[in-house]
């Protein structure tokens, strides 16, 4: 990877998106993971720290304290303004009013609450919400629809997870963040690779084959293809019933 050119291209993209929208900057959710840290580094490089605002939104009992510490360290080292909002009370009140849901519904509630907080602050500040999703997650639908998928633009959305690790190291993201097991922190002890049943290295290898139109005759390949196909609705605008020809 030509890191210098990749960073230059992404920074130009960030500046262009913000400028064309008439926004004053960006808001992003900073989790303490490698994706959000990488996006923070890129946004600050593109716009300057004064135009990047971070929200750190842990769930006590689920989010490890190290994640919170890492997120704060990233924000402070980059000179970004940030706010820490624990989401436990919001989750509790929501469930009291809406009633108990299934495990997956309650897990997806957390990123959807974080999305609302991102946009609440972005609207108040006339800013855009910077997404932190990578190409691997986008292709297989490993994100919550209208949760962490609810963003205005995706700086690292064309980089596979394994490439994000490389870019993070180039940008100077702390080593302990890069080496951390990727996790959406949907429940205690949850990790991305265990939930998907495949490592990011294996996943990216298969996704690159799919992108090239090549195939492989094994169960893992077929399962990844199925993940891509079943999550198509997450990557597209809602379908519209066409009736104009009847009017």
Swiss-Prot record:
Sequence positions that bind ATP: 29-36, 132, 161, 183
Catalytic activity, as annotated: deamido-NAD(+) + NH4(+) + ATP = AMP + diphosphate + NAD(+) + H(+)
Pfam families: NAD_synthase
InterPro entries, sorted: NAD/GMP_synthase, NAD_synthase, NH(3)-dep_NAD(+)_synth, Rossmann-like_a/b/a_fold
Protein residues bound to deamido-NAD(+): 112, 145, 152, 233-234
One GO process term, biological-process aspect: NAD biosynthetic process
Keyword Transport tagged: no
GO MF annotation terms: ATP binding; glutaminase activity; metal ion binding; NAD+ synthase (glutamine-hydrolyzing) activity; NAD+ synthase activity
Binding sites annotated in the UniProt record for Mg(2+): 35, 137
Gene3D superfamilies noted in UniProt: HUPs
Keywords noted in UniProt: ATP-binding, Ligase, Magnesium, Metal-binding, NAD, Nucleotide-binding
Protein's pathway: Cofactor biosynthesis; NAD(+) biosynthesis; NAD(+) from deamido-NAD(+) (ammonia route): step 1/1
Assigned GO CC terms: cytoplasm
Catalytic activity, EC: 6.3.1.5
Known role: Catalyzes the ATP-dependent amidation of deamido-NAD to form NAD. Uses ammonia as a nitrogen source.
Similarity comment: family membership: Belongs to the NAD synthetase family.
HAMAP family (alphabetical): NadE_ammonia_dep (MF_00193)
NCBIfam families cross-referenced by the UniProt entry: nadE, PRK13980.1
Assembly: Homodimer.
Protein name: NH(3)-dependent NAD(+) synthetase
Species the sequence originates in: Archaeoglobus fulgidus (strain ATCC 49558 / DSM 4304 / JCM 9628 / NBRC 100126 / VC-16)
